[in-house]
Regions:
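Residue-level detector of functionally pivotal "anchor" positions at catalytic/ligand-binding pockets or at interdomain
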Residues: 356-376, 390, 406-407, 453-455
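Asp-box/WD-like beta-propeller blade repeats and closely related beta-sheet repeat scaffolds
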Residues: 120-156
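C-terminal tail/sorting-segment detector
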Residues: 382-384, 411, 428-455
């Protein structure tokens, strides 16, 4: 991931529109969507993350880290067992995970968990070697004396830095003390030291304060906007915009339905509480275009996946907020797969939310008898060939990465055999990763997934 400006993490000029979330009503999925159980038998999967090589990693609260080698692989492979502190009466355990954005060239996986001995919450970097974990390095360690409010979500930001949440450990005052570690989101360099430019000095790892227990942390891959969910006490669960140097108000003087002076209001608050968990900002192209830029977040109390739509060109102003789907188990995390679909973790299963309509198919081998698209070889270490049928004079073929960047395009009439050398229109080499190859013609649209391993 190339660093991007922090323009949406800057507090200056921020104009947040806050809403009190309405009482949500569950109902059927929007037309064309379907929820499919992809994997059963998982044990409290706190985090789902896809690696650029196509593996689906997940963490379990009790310490197991595992992955599915591909989207369709039936059983998981254990990557490691982490010696976590776990007590079912509290919130200790394994909480978060991030895969290095340059994986597998930088073969690192970052885990956040409550360490058993000595007792602490840790951010640890592991190396993936031949499909198993090795060479652990502790990047940061913070107190974990309380069984509650650990947070522990970890994500890479648009600037390439590591963002890690830590709850207040039931010490409300720590959330309002910039020098204390409780109730913060940290911004760290890849070696674990405080990142340059943090708001409270070069030795302070925190980027925001005044939080209670963050279980969701995500970034818009297109423009870098950050969002997080926070769990209130008996009131005021929140969805927040991540703003550099902001104080979100939680502390001894933060009453229910209050807003202490000098603090940043939430984008949305929930009363009664819903216990929000993981979040994801959708930029895929397997769903209708109206879902582009939609924030999805999961909840524990009501077992739902919510969606937030923002006003045009205003990622700090909520347009609509509603329930997308209600599951039959508590929901822990949501992420986007290389197929462009949302993948959701509940307490015992992993789900895939697919979408189909008469003119769009993703990895459908026979979307139309007159229209076809083949990608060979796939995965690829170098050049690939796109074999097309049914392309008319107005046809278009595109290669797009998962952040929405168009790397190469051809407009037609198209040849039935098109070679791609792995470079952009300007000659820039495309990095290792997952790409979508899309053929659009008057007969319809086909999208294929391409895994690029080198070249």
């Amino acid at each position: 991931m190339s660093p991007a400006p922090l323009r949406h993490l800057l507090l200056a000029g921020l104009s947040i529109t806050m809403i009190a979330a309405p009482a949500a009503q569950s109902g059927p999925l929007p037309n064309g969507f379907q929820v499919v159980r992809s994997h059963a038998g998982v044990n409290f999967p706190t985090t789902l993350r896809f690696a650029p090589d196509g593996r689906l990693f997940f963490t379990e609260l009790t310490g197991r880290v595992a992955y599915y080698p591909s989207l369709s692989y039936p059983s998981s492979v254990t990557w490691d067992f982490i010696p976590v502190m776990y007590d079912p009466s509290g919130e200790w355990g394994q909480h978060g995970m991030a895969v290095h954005p340059d994986f597998p060239d930088s073969p690192y996986v970052y885990l956040s968990y409550s360490n058993l001995s000595p007792l602490s919450d840790r951010l640890v970097r592991y190396t993936d070697k031949l499909g198993v974990a090795s060479d652990s390095t502790v990047l940061m360690s913070v107190p974990a004396d309380s069984p509650y409010h650990h947070g522990g979500r970890v994500a890479f930001g648009p600037d390439g830095m590591i963002y890690w949440s830590h709850g207040d450990q039931t010490d409300m005052a720590s959330a309002q003390d910039p020098s204390a570690l409780g109730g913060k989101i940290f911004r760290l360099g890849r070696g674990g030291l405080p990142a340059p430019g943090n708001p409270w000095g070069p030795s302070n790892p925190a980027i925001v304060m005044g939080i209670r227990n963050v279980f969701g942390l995500c970034f818009d891959p297109l423009n870098g906007t950050g969002y997080f969910t926070d769990n209130g006490p008996e009131c005021d669960d929140e969805v927040n915009l991540l703003a550099f140097g902001a104080n979100y108000g939680w502390g001894p003087n933060d009453p229910c339905n209050g807003q202490p002076a000098g603090t940043v209001p939430a984008l949305a608050t929930f009363n009664p509480t819903i216990a929000p968990t993981g979040c994801w900002l959708y930029r895929g192209n397997a769903y209708p275009s109206r879902y582009d830029g939609t924030l999805f977040f999961a909840t524990w109390n009501d077992s739902r996946l919510y969606r937030v739509r923002f006003k045009a060109n205003h990622p700090d102003q909520v347009d609509t907020l509603d329930v997308f789907y209600t599951f039959n188990e508590q929901v822990l995390d949501v992420t986007e797969g290389p197929d462009g679909f949302l993948w959701v973790a509940t307490t015992g299963s992993i789900w895939r939310i697919t979408y189909t309509n008469p003119t769009i198919a993703v990895d459908d081998p026979t979307p139309s008898p007159l229209l076809s698209l083949g990608v060979v070889p796939n995965p690829s270490y170098g050049a690939v060939a796109f074999n097309t049928r049914g392309s008319a004079a107005s046809a278009r073929l595109e290669v797009i990465d998962l952040q929405g960047r168009r790397w190469r395009s051809w407009s037609g009439p198209l040849s039935s055999h098109i070679a791609w050398d792995g470079r952009s229109d300007s000659g820039e080499p495309a990095p290792v990763g997952v790409y979508l190859v899309r053929l659009t013609s008057p007969l319809g649209t086909i999208t294929r997934r391409l895994i690029r391993l080198g070249g």
